[in-house]
Amino acid sequence: MQIDDALLQRLEKLSMLEIKDEHKESVKGHLAEILGFVENIFALETSALKTDTELCTPLREDEPKSQPNTAKEILSQNKHSQDHYFVVPKIIE
């Protein structure tokens, strides 16, 4: 694909960007380079590659653990707690 002034102007309009005249040739070169990379990717032969779409994530067994004193230990570290909650200064009036 050839990057010409008409295509660059269309891309400017679609992206709502303005490319200064002194940068247009540089941008055209960069876009041509990017399109070259994309064409190389499309040219790759991928039909022999194995897809990994059927992989599943191994899950661990859920093992509930009873830790009744954890909340009490955490709240005991704070000076201000009430009814099993932290008490913090009011910030919204």
From Swiss-Prot:
Catalytic activity: L-glutamyl-tRNA(Gln) + L-glutamine + ATP + H2O = L-glutaminyl-tRNA(Gln) + L-glutamate + ADP + phosphate + H(+); L-aspartyl-tRNA(Asn) + L-glutamine + ATP + H2O = L-asparaginyl-tRNA(Asn) + L-glutamate + ADP + phosphate + 2 H(+)
Record-level GO BP terms: regulation of translational fidelity; translation
GO molecular function (one): glutaminyl-tRNA synthase (glutamine-hydrolyzing) activity
Protein family per UniProt: Belongs to the GatC family.
Enzyme kind, highest EC tier: ligase
EC number: 6.3.5.-
UniProt xrefs under InterPro entries: Asp/Glu-ADT_sf_sub_c (IPR036113), GatC (IPR003837)
Lineage: Bacteria, Pseudomonadati, Campylobacterota, Epsilonproteobacteria, Campylobacterales
Subunit structure: Heterotrimer of A, B and C subunits.
Name used for this protein in its record: Aspartyl/glutamyl-tRNA(Asn/Gln) amidotransferase subunit C
UniProtKB keywords: ATP-binding, Ligase, Nucleotide-binding, Protein biosynthesis
Residues spanning the membrane: none
Biological role stated in the UniProt entry: Allows the formation of correctly charged Asn-tRNA(Asn) or Gln-tRNA(Gln) through the transamidation of misacylated Asp-tRNA(Asn) or Glu-tRNA(Gln) in organisms which lack either or both of asparaginyl-tRNA or glutaminyl-tRNA synthetases. The reaction takes place in the presence of glutamine and ATP through an activated phospho-Asp-tRNA(Asn) or phospho-Glu-tRNA(Gln).
Entries under Pfam families matching the protein: GatC
